[in-house]
Amino acid sequence: MIAAPEIPTDFNLLQESETHFSSDTDFEDIEGKNQKQGKGKTCKKGKKGPAEKGKGGNGGGKPPSGPNRMNGHHQQNGVENMMLFEVVKMGKSAMQSVVDDWIESYKHDRDIALLDLINFFIQCSGCKGVVTAEMFRHMQNSEIIRKMTEEFDEDSGDYPLTMAGPQWKKFKSSFCEFIGVLVRQCQYSIIYDEYMMDTVISLLTGLSDSQVRAFRHTSTLAAMKLMTALVNVALNLSINMDNTQRQYEAERNKMIGKRANERLELLLQKRKELQENQDEIENMMNAIFKGVFVHRYRDAIAEIRAICIEEIGIWMKMYSDAFLNDSYLKYVGWTMHDKQGEVRLKCLTALQGLYYNKELNSKLELFTSRFKDRIVSMTLDKEYDVAVQAIKLLTLVLQSSEEVLTAEDCENVYHLVYSAHRPVAVAAGEFLYKKLFSRRDPEEDGMMKRRGRQGPNANLVKTLVFFFLESELHEHAAYLVDSMWDCATELLKDWECMNSLLLEEPLSGEEALTDRQESALIEIMLCTIRQAAECHPPVGRGTGKRVLTAKEKKTQLDDRTKITELFAVALPQLLAKYSVDAEKVTNLLQLPQYFDLEIYTTGRLEKHLDALLRQIRNIVEKHTDTDVLEACSKTYHALCNEEFTIFNRVDISRSQLIDELADKFNRLLEDFLQEGEEPDEDDAYQVLSTLKRITAFHNAHDLSKWDLFACNYKLLKTGIENGDMPEQIVIHALQCTHYVILWQLAKITESSSTKEDLLRLKKQMRVFCQICQHYLTNVNTTVKEQAFTILCDILMIFSHQIMSGGRDMLEPLVYTPDSSLQSELLSFILDHVFIEQDDDNNSADGQQEDEASKIEALHKRRNLLAAFCKLIVYTVVEMNTAADIFKQYMKYYNDYGDIIKETMSKTRQIDKIQCAKTLILSLQQLFNEMIQENGYNFDRSSSTFSGIKELARRFALTFGLDQLKTREAIAMLHKDGIEFAFKEPNPQGESHPPLNLAFLDILSEFSSKLLRQDKRTVYVYLEKFMTFQMSLRREDVWLPLMSYRNSLLAGGDDDTMSVISGISSRGSTVRSKKSKPSTGKRKVVEGMQLSLTEESSSSDSMWLSREQTLHTPVMMQTPQLTSTIMREPKRLRPEDSFMSVYPMQTEHHQTPLDYNRRGTSLMEDDEEPIVEDVMMSSEGRIEDLNEGMDFDTMDIDLPPSKNRRERTELKPDFFDPASIMDESVLGVSMF
């Protein structure tokens, strides 16, 4: 047992215990450590008689007898036979009654009452020991704490403050409440008796220095709460002294005849008593601050550090005259560099309480100037909670004084409105709003009642637009709006103002919006309307849609009504004004999907609906841009809702538009495809533009009645025959035909269909697949990519999955690609996805655009690869085609590593053995490619061969730790690998190694994944291919065989998992080595092996002969899983595990103490935490801030009364940079 550190020898606060937990030499005068101690280092000893041996009380200290006393607690309020700990633990009794009972006990016999209180703190620490009256009288603090340490339960690291469960849920709050109430009830007498507080403070100081975390944590919390209660007492004393001083001054200023001398004497006496009491409180607070806080605020346990910082924040806020100065603020400033987020969070919340009170700002100026940069950098903290509070703190700093934060500081916060983490973004949005939008000029007061362009929000909307454009993140308007939604709702919902800024002419002297600003305003307006209508954050921010409250639903309905009433009238005007601007029109056309369409009828707005439909028709005729046309299509889809009466009106308009487009397309196509005539560019443009419009509408609308398959088929077939069809026409014809197929399938699936419908769709689908296959060999890359993407979609949709969900009637539509099509798809991937990035065009002018194009190209290639991998995962194509994909894993890891890895995982879930065979096939392909390039006499140390080995190692890692689950797959992998290695005999004879023998070097990377018995089985199988001469060879060329054999013969020591690992997550629990396994246990192991009940008819294909006792089923042609462990894993006892038969050698390593998690050990080394900067991005990283700090050990001195000018013992200002931190440590000036 590690002894507790030495504690002061009695209940005297004179000495500061020298901690074994942290070297707090920063706070001590090393050279004059034992010299005379100044004021504040002591609390006076209680006055005791000669017969009282240092403990005071009723002489012998015997507990009183009587019915009203039990365990030092009165039997009142229904609480009987309970100690203080039990009462606080229950948390049901009124705490004041509990404390009053203890005070009565203390007045009767203070030693016995204090003994109860001491045992209360011991029990609250989770210690089962009890301090007896004899120990209390005769033993010193250090001896008592050492004795209690020995009574601790070492098997568990839990104690009341950390225990889980409902009974402990409120323990901490009850514990803290008890201490606060105790001091409050004792504040007028008992705390000044120079005994009770001396005893408690000395005990808590000693416990807080213990190496037992439970003692340290509990006593630190108690001491800090005790200090907080004393600060409150000191504050009350200060108020009383001020009142007494005012009364005294008023009485003394009276005329001599009216002056009451007796009252003056009483007031002087009262002031003197209050002064003495204040001095006593100062001594107590000094003792706690120096004995506990200055040591524990740097404790190794984050919870303890957090307690200290939280409480010092309360002291500074509660009694700012005494504590809000740089001598105490420095502790918070230093701790902002703490390595644990919860401690940094406490620092920020403590500072928020101070900055919130504007009256305290003058006292924070020096602190702000020193630590402002740190606070700004914490907005990028890796802990999001810390970042949020840092931004909120800066918002308070901004409100207190705008001059403190520079433009650069503000910009560091501004960009966080685009953060994907919503709480961070919302906090940054509030900061932005306070900085740029909350101020209003006096001249704007007269504009409050105005609306629209002349309203008070007009300038603010412009400011928002300017900010959005300057941020240069034009694709993230939704994020900006969401960030400011909570704090600037009124501004963001002023759609009337936004609309007037777009439609109305600027006033005289007002600068009009530029084209770029109008585009930005329209985008922001769209995002605000979407946010109001949908009531959830944009994609990528938040956890998805939540259930709206009744109030939120009402607000949503009101907003949609307001949006519809305004924009049903304004939208046609906006479309007319910006009809030629594709970007603006695209955004404006999205508004109707957020309308309440019923208002068109109830509000008699049909004429505005007609105007909207006319504008959409005009836009379709004017534009050929795909985004604009799709926006028009979606708008028609939103308006064509059969639930509303406007459906007929919109449907007629849509049908008329499609009729005209279809007729025009057929007419143009007939002219375009006339034989013998060369189509000119104008004809091609007309065909393309019309086809674009039809394709865009076919995306959202069923146009089956216009029979678009025939004309598109004719167009595509002509393109194949002639080979001169413009690429854009082919691309859109393929896409349009794809939509035709999908709409027909949807119609067949949703309603009963005839056999003729199925056969017609089957024929069209097969013909279309053949056309797409033809276009895979087109000379144009864009056409090939479109054909490949559509072909993958068609194969996926019409695979065997189409019959799932009870749709067996669709079986005739199932289409399985033949080997030639699979081969062409794979060739396309190899030729167009696994290619090197073109780095030629890197001019300075076009570098940024070039980077953007590269990213876009990579994104396109990733989509192509994902489409093909989906075919592999859903077994639409053969799994072995994945070998050509898997072998690219290392080479293209940065670009496609995640896709390939996920494909491996999914294929392994489908078929472990086939996946393993595919992996080994990919390695064999790479090996063969290396042989073709370098010949059989290649260098095994070459980068190419090393790369293949590294790929094998990566493949091995993907099998995970559960060897039992992958047992068969790994065995089959070794089988295929061995056969490949010996497949090509050396033409020079058996004295030379087989041509592929070096492949065994690659195969050895998988040996660690074999179970012990399977290693023996694989070794036996390997020997079937070896001759006697091979086993004797030791030349370098035979090294792969030797290393592979050794990896199989390594046996148990190389095994990292036992068979039982697949059954129990507990793993091996062997604590001691066993000499020899019992026979019974050996039988269990043999029973765990996968046995064979059938033999292969061909002996050549068998791994083992019948005489061999170890069997690995995957090495047979017909594997059968007959093992008990595979069927009923729970029947195995832990003592019968594989590990108990083959005990692993245990290596003892010295494990460093991990402060990031609470362990279960009783004793701890009290290392000082490394204070580190944990920012994502920070400058001027401070290394080990605590090291070399020269802490001052100032006394707590309460400020003099504002009217007590005669007091001369005023303390100097302790804020001395030299006493705070040695500047040589940081290399920068502290302030």
From Swiss-Prot:
Keywords: Acetylation, Cell cycle, Cell division, Centromere, Chromosome, Chromosome partition, Disease variant, Holoprosencephaly, Meiosis, Mitosis, Nucleus, Phosphoprotein
Principal subcellular localisation of the protein: nucleus
Domain of life from the UniProt record: Eukaryota
Modified residues (Phosphothreonine): 1112
N6-acetyllysine modified-residue sites: 607
Skewed-composition ranges (Basic residues): 36-48, 1071-1082
Compartment list: Nucleus; Chromosome; Chromosome, Centromere
PTM entry text: Phosphorylated by PLK1. The large dissociation of cohesin from chromosome arms during prophase is partly due to its phosphorylation.
SUPFAM superfamilies membership: ARM repeat
Subunit structure, as described in the record: Interacts directly with RAD21 in cohesin complex. Cohesin complexes are composed of a heterodimer between a SMC1 protein (SMC1A or SMC1B) and SMC3, which are attached via their hinge domain, and RAD21 which link them at their heads, and one STAG protein (STAG1, STAG2 or STAG3). In cohesin complexes, STAG2 is mutually exclusive with STAG1 and STAG3.
Protein role: Component of cohesin complex, a complex required for the cohesion of sister chromatids after DNA replication. The cohesin complex apparently forms a large proteinaceous ring within which sister chromatids can be trapped. At anaphase, the complex is cleaved and dissociates from chromatin, allowing sister chromatids to segregate. The cohesin complex may also play a role in spindle pole assembly during mitosis.
Disease: Mullegama-Klein-Martinez syndrome: An X-linked neurodevelopmental disorder with variable features including intellectual deficiency, microcephaly, microtia, hearing loss, developmental delay, dysmorphic features, language delay, congenital heart defect, and clinodactyly of the 5th finger.
Family note: Belongs to the SCC3 family.
The name this protein goes by in its record: Cohesin subunit SA-2
Native source species: Homo sapiens
Gene name of the record: STAG2
